[in-house]
Amino acid sequence: IDLLVIHRWDYDTPIEETMRALNDLVKSGKVLYIGASAMYAWQFQKAQNIAERNGRTKFISMQNHYNLLYREDEHELLPYCKDANIQLTPYSPLGCGQINKGLAGGYASL
């Protein structure tokens, strides 16, 4: 697997256990890289810090909810990812259809 992405923070499992398991998958050669999706900035940074502190594999990507209507991640998550050189793969770029409503032939009706 080139990139294994975990989706959402698991409140029932200690993040140390999750990061250890992900590291084991990378070290075994079953996974090349790991990424995360749909986490708060503090959760993502906590996971990264735990991985770094324990010499484990860190995330290389964040799949975040981002579009013209939802830009909340611009406050903390995006600046953190930019500073840490973590790639972003936004989901819902058309806002679940809210942004492209009224488009005809690919152009907005004015």
Cite the ranges covered by each PLM segment.
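Beta/alpha (TIM)-barrel catalytic core signal, keyed to glycine-rich beta->alpha loops juxtaposed to Asp/Glu
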Residues: 10-110
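Acidic/hydrophobic-patterned starts of short beta strands in beta-sheet-rich repeat architectures
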Residues: 3-4
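Histidine-centered active-site/metal-ligand motif
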Residues: 7
